[in-house]
Amino acid sequence: MPGHRGAPHLPPWVCGLCSMDDFAEGGLSLADDILLEDYPYEDDCICTPDFTTDDYVRVTQLYYEGVGMQYKDYAQSEKNLEYDICNIWCSKPLSILQDYCDAIKLYIFWPLLFQHQHSSIISRLHPCVEAIRSRAAEISLKKLQHLELMEDIVDLAKKVANDSFLIEGLLKIGYKIENKILAMEDALNWIKYTGDVTILPKLGSVDSGWPMLSIFFTEYKYHITRVVTENCNLLEEFRRHSCMQCVKQGELMKMRGNEEFAKEKFEIAVIYYTRAIEYRPENHLLYGNRALCFLRMGQFRNALSDGKRAIVLKNTWPKGHYRYCDALSMLGEYDWALQANIKAQKLCKNDPEGIKDLIQQHIKLQKQIEDLQGRTSNRNPIKAFYESRAYIPRNSSAPAFRTSLNFVETERGFRKTKYRMANGGGHQNQKVADEALKGDDCDCHPEFLPPPSQPPRHKGKQKSRNNESEKPSSNSQVTLQVDLKSILEKQFSKSSRAAHQDFANIMKMLRSLIQDGYTALLEQRCRSAAQAFTELLNGLDPQKIKQLNLAMINYVLVVYGLAVSLLGIGRPEELSEAENQFKRIIEHYPNEGLDCLAYCGIGKVYLKKNRFLEALNHFEKAKTLICRLPGILTWPTSNVIIEESKPEKVKVMLEKFVEECKFPPVPDAVCCYQKCRGFSKIQIYLTDPDFKGFIRISCCQYCKVEFHMNCWKKLKTTTFNDKIDKDFLQGICLTPDCEGIISKIIIFSSGGQVKCEFEHKVVKEKAPSRPVLKQKCSSLEKLRLKEDKKLKRKIQKQEAKKLAQERMEEDLRESNPPKPEEPEETVESAQSCQFLDDRILQCIKQNADKIKSVVLNTSTLLKELLSWKVLSTEDYTTCFSSKNFVHEAVDYVIGHLIQEKNRVKTRIFLHVLSELKELDPKLAPWIQRLNSFGLDATGPFFTRYGASLKELDFNIVTFLWSEKYGHKLGSIEGKQLDYFCEPASVMEARCLIWLLEEHRDKFPALHSALDEFFDIMDSRCTVLRKQDSDEMPFGCIKVKNKGKKKKPKDSKPMLVGSGTASVTPSSETVTPEDHNRRNSDSAGPFAVPDHLRQDVEEFEALYDQHSSEYVVRNKKLWDINPKQKCSTLYDYFSQLLEEHGPLDMSDRMFSEEYEFFPEETRQILEKAGGLKSFLLGCPRFVVIDNCIALKKVASRLKKKRKKKNIKTKVEEISKTGEYLRVKLPLNPTAREFQPDVKSEAAAEDVTSIPGPADSSAPAAEDLKPQLDSDSSSGSASEDSRLEVVSPDLPTPLCEDASPSPTPAPEDAKPTYWTQSHLVTGFCTYLPFQGFGIAQSRPAYINMVPSLSQFTSIYTPLANISSEYPMPRSMPVVPSFVASERADGNAAAYFESHRLNTENASDDHTASETQILEGPLGMCVKSQSSTADARTALSEPEGNSRHSGSSDSLWEASLENVSGITDVPPAPSVAIQVSRSLIHQEVNTEPYAPFERQQGDLSQKEKECHLLREQLQVACEECEQMELRSSQETRDLEEKLQRHAEENKVSLPELQWALGKLDREIKKWHQEKKEIQERLKALKKKIKKVINTSDMSAQKNDGLDKECESQPDQSLGISSALTDEKAKVEESVRKGKELYEESQQRAVAAEVSVLENWKEREVCKLQGVATQAEACLKSLKLMNSDSAAYPDVECDILSWETFLSTVTEEIENTKCQFEEQIKAIKSGSRLSDLSSVQVSELLFPACSMIHPQLLSESSRHEDHGLVACVDSMTGAVLNDPYVGPDSGCSEEVPELSLGSPTHHPEGAQQLEVKKASQVSPSEQNPEADEKPSGQATRSSQSQKNPFNSIIEHLSVIFPCYASSELSGFIKKVRNKSKNSFSGLSIEEIVERVTEHIVEEQKKKKPNPGKDKKTSEAHPAASVSKSSPSPPLAAAGPSAKTKGQKKDDVPAPDGNSCQICHEIFKSKNMRVLKCGHKFHKGCFKQWLKGQSTCPTCGSSDLLSEE
């Protein structure tokens, strides 16, 4: 209270360094210690009873004992003062007043939040103050509520700071409270008049409301008074109490805290921030930073406390509010945090940056509250709602529903509640309380009194982080805030008016809850409806429902509403609860007629669970009970009809449900677990409420086994030992009797999507399907018709495109000038045409129903579209306002997109659809694929138009991006175009294209690019329709392959995979697999886009021209089986032959195609024995004249044959053979004469190279890989030809061989195929007879008669044993040459399986059969030896030196020839006979004179022909070389000349460049040196830094280890420091109090010293005046005898003048001492004041006085006076406060100066004699001690104890003389048995004083004494007027009885004479004798005594 404030008032935030040094230790009172020790810390208490009880019991007692009667006098005296203060205050500017209010708020809240000193009245009265300071950092939620309430009260004054009426009222209330006048009514009315109606209910709910109000009014009154009366500037006072040292230290600690915070060392940061707060406790930033640290550390209550402190220090700081709200939300107080956030936004509205953060926080808090409301909690949601509103009941005036119902039950039995004061003292005297209630009906309104129950708590979540939630009261089910006025009216009134009012309130709340329930139910807010109905059921009791005038059916309808709400929620728990509620209606309320609705509800529950059979049973039961419905029902207390209660509607609804249950949908899966307990249902639906996914296992035999996930886990646990799902692959199928292998496992998640999939491909061999062949048109008419159709289609396509283009242009023209009166049909047609531009939108419109079925959560879709700005806020509101919102939302959005025709919004809608999690898994892939088109098109778009995009101003794009997508996507500030080209930024790239499209007006250069992106690149889903069938629906377009037919002579492309053996036929040969795949992949007919037409036309032209040069490969069809591969090869060759006709085996087409065959294809052909054998394996192919042809064209080829009968020609030739041999000349141009070499060395090399002697015959399989490699070698030119012929051969004459229709056996087929272009032809039958060996199967030799190049066919015969002699040479088949290519040879080896191959001796024989075809087609028989075979084999090798391209072929054929043995050579002659004469004897001699042996002539002709050709070629080459060389020479000369000229020009440039290069090199060298020097320096620095860092790292490691090893020490040190800090703070407080007390005592002591000095000097002067009066009296007596004394008149005059001078000196001395006393009281020190100067007065010279007369007349008085003067002088000498300097000037002059007589000396001698009577044992040595240097000018050197006693008694009783006092001393000594031993001077003085007082009581007033009394009256008046008590005048050594020497402070006029405490209020009493006492102390004294405790005076009348 202000009355308790000390004089030196310092603000509470003064730092410790600024004020700590001035404090002394100790001084804390015992009461304060007890208060600090005994004060409890109760975290959940609101106000401790003994906290305010004592003070306010006294206040109440004083008020009702009559103190309040003094208010009239008080009001009259203070009225004008309040008015003046209020006017001066309100005259100041409003801004200054508001700043003052903020400063006053800090004064009020400082002891509550920042400084916890319980000695102040604020902290004692306020419940928020913590008692234990170690926990002062935390503030409990309940105390925080009181702090906020206190803050609201304090903020009221700021609102009305310049309102004179309210300010004046505030001052009046403050004065009343200070003077202990109860002013509760005035205080509450003042709050009510301010206009804030929310504070009064809050105050009513708090027990400590009155202390808050008293603190508010008194503090504001005090500070306003200070501002006005003392002209105190609170703002300056607040700012100036921080020294620079504290500011610097605080900033240093703050910076260190910031550094630790940046390192995320929050605990250390908290320590530094705390140290900074100790230096600067008024800095709000420090509390905010520390709150943030606490938030990061999870200490939310500490963060809450610091956030509140920061707000109090600066309420316009947004960050403080933000952290405060964060802490509240972390503690679960979301509603509270939301309210605090709203208040913060109002306070911080001038800070735009901070308000943004607060708004975001507001949105986040709202979302959290919505999420909490959406979840099902354990508590009653309605209870939680009302509990959250309990603390601030702004909108509810009626009591809570449950509480009201309880009151209805007990309204007649309540009892009167005991009245309690607002301070919460429950143990007060009931009588006093009742008197208070009766005495003043207005001071305590019932409206503002608290209820008797436990005070409410602010609730958020049920439990906060620190478990601070309150347990519910045991008396009531819920703890709710109730309207206080209505509760008190119920409690204090028994009238029926209260009950009626309560009933009205109950019905009002009942209607409100029912309305909330059915409204939420109609709007499908099922959770809100369930909450409302649950609250109703919790409040309603069905047994007492009639008390509310409600029927039982109303209660049943509430139960039905709850069940329907739970059914609408749809979760398994809610569905079970709904089923229970419906069953409850059936079982407990069967008479209400709602059985039909209950059975229907149960059926709906089962239908939700997809249990169709159970649902069908209940629906059928409900159909039978429709007749029992009571009629159309409405919701209770309303007129809203329940639609289900209409019989016709129920009937229709039940029929619909029954039909649905009779024909249920196909389940998505069926659980196969035998013990499946899935709610009696093995069917699995994705829409099951309890759907948690399932697993599907498939095997290769198409079995599907499915399980619930729970069933699958059980099955794995019990049967498969928890086997991993993936391990089931390749296992046996789980289906019984199935032998398949598990090939696929799919696991579906709870959302219905594929969670994971495992697959193992099991390849099943299938029979090759017969390819679909496209036959050629057989007639020209059909070809012409086909071409006409193609042309017609082409024309129609062009017309359709043209028509579409015209329609688009027409729509554009119509859209530019809008016509308001346009018909609806035109709009629709234009709209349909417009969709051709945006194909995505067209697709969305056509599939709207599917999209509608896909979306399962429409609210999420709409929110996302709203966030993407596809929908505006108005559209969103319009969509939500629809009653059928859920079903119409998607339709509305699609219609909106169609109306907008915005390409970007359409694609955003598609993107949002694809991002939705709750999508139907059946259509989700289609939507995602549709959405992926745009993502795939971004790459080509940026590639094509990257140059145009780089020219854009990215600042504008960045701004537009932030405006459009800143809230959804990250910022693109600082990013370039390359960022969007990255694969990871595809989404951002597409959004950039969307942004450019939306702002296309700003980018005109990109119009065409954007149109291309949205029309073509991003719209692959639809294409142009065929114009010839416009009526056909779009989805029914027939897919037709439009592959272009090639011309008959063009080669078809073939698909040959390079890595796999696969051949795919062209488009005209379609297999069923290809047909199916094409049908599945094609989405419709294909139209070539405009931008690709030119490229396609060029491609087609090139394709038609070079179709035979393209080879396409395909790798897909060769993974099947070999049969399919062979079939594909047959198809391929069929197409080839069909296009090109019959082909020769040596045709280039075969060789070129074979080169590109993969390895597997070649192996297939090799296994078959070559291409010919392979093709003959298929019945489609035949061989005609060594030409491969199709069987269907064989008849045509036979007609064209020129030689029809080969056998006849052979016979004719054999008959005329002799004639031909003699007569016919040789034909030099014959085919056999064409040489096969290019040089003459060919013939020489034939015999020079021997064949392999010891070559074994490897198996045919071993030859295959080697010969395959040979087939890949290149071919030589056609000019190089080689023929292996014996030189003795005559001119050969041969004929064509006829083909054999019999196919060759398996063992006689060719074993390998050497060349790709050499294929075997038809077979020739060669019989072997008469060799003396066993008859063997005939051998077959493949012949190729149509090949133009030579071909060597080696036919190894059987190995012949040595026991069989060879009588003659073996006839063999003559060889022939049938090849046109120099490097080609076809060698086929075969061996009969009947020949003996096991006996492989060295005498193997082999012959080579060379079949030569002559110009006449004759074949002769020849026999060759082994040597001839070697020659024949070696000749090609010799030729290979000149034919480099055939080297590898010949090497392979030499190495791999089998059957060549080392048989002795036999004569080898080439037999040139006809085939018919092969077994007859013929002349084979050489033809002389032309040849020495057979064949020489032919050999020579061949050589000459070869040489001539070589010469001709050489001449041609020489001419060409000369032409080329001359041309090259000219070109080189020109180049040389140009180079010379250029060198001349470039030489000076080179020199200049070299010079510049030298300069640059020098410069670079210099820079290099500098850089190297810098590098060296940097390396040194780096090395130093590394060393330093290593050392610091080692130190840090050491420190870390120390810190880790000593965690407990840090805790101990911290606790020790905390204790030490507490002790230091305690010492500081004690020192401060001791300092204040010592200062007061010092002032009192200095005042007492000055008063003693004043009395001493005055006594001296009074003694002189007394002597002067005595002398003057004597002179006046002698004046009668004028003769004897002639100068009497003159002496009288001089003595009178002396007497007046003494009187003036007395007054002057008093004035001087009074001035010094005032100066000391005002703050001066005694040592600083100048000493009081007292002038020395001398007695006037008077020789006429007779000494005897003088002694006789004044022996009594003079003696007393002299003793008094001596005693006063002794007192001055014994005064310890008088120093040597001051003692000289203040001594009283001796009376003997100027006096003719020596009476003073005689008086002194008399007193010495009296003092000598005291025995030495009675003398106190302490009383005899005298300081050195303090002696009087008399001869007395020491003062005995008797003189000290006399001095003390003279001061107390100045009216007695020293002789009388000596007599009193003797009497007291006689009573004490003549001894004062053991008694101190003080005790003796006390006894003598008591004796004198008793004597005065006994004696009556004596007339004789009046004279003495009147004479001594000046001295008594001086003593009475002195402010100090008489007993204290004896000096500071005077002690009272029972007091210790050091405990008693110096007595003062401002302290009580009994308890010696300084008066701190007006509660004091002054007696007539001048002594002052506390009223309480004096009353206690009067109980046993009736005299003054100090002087013993019995006159106790008050002089107040």
From Swiss-Prot:
It is found in: Nucleus; Cytoplasm; Golgi apparatus. Its EC number is 2.3.2.27. Residues 1059-1070, 1829-1839 have a biased composition (Polar residues). It comes from Rattus norvegicus. InterPro entries: DEATH-like_dom_sf (IPR011029), TPR-like_helical_dom_sf (IPR011990), TPR_rpt (IPR019734), TTC3/DZIP3-like_helical (IPR056872), TTC3/DZIP3/RBM44-like_helical (IPR056870), TTC3/DZIP3_dom (IPR043866), wHTH_TTC3 (IPR056871), Znf_RING (IPR001841). Residues 1268-1277, 1912-1934 have a biased composition (Low complexity). TPR repeats lie at residues 250-283, 284-317, 556-592, 596-629. Residues 442-478, 804-828, 1041-1087, 1233-1308, 1423-1448, 1806-1839, 1894-1947 are annotated as: Disordered. The modification Phosphoserine is found at residues 397, 1029, 1080. GO terms for biological process: negative regulation of axon extension; negative regulation of neuron differentiation; protein K48-linked ubiquitination; ubiquitin-dependent protein catabolic process. It comes from the Eukaryota. Keywords: Cytoplasm, Golgi apparatus, Metal-binding, Nucleus, Phosphoprotein, Repeat, TPR repeat, Transferase, Zinc, Zinc-finger. SUPFAM superfamilies: RING/U-box, TPR-like. This is E3 ubiquitin-protein ligase TTC3. PROSITE patterns: TPR (PS50005), TPR_REGION (PS50293), ZF_RING_2 (PS50089).
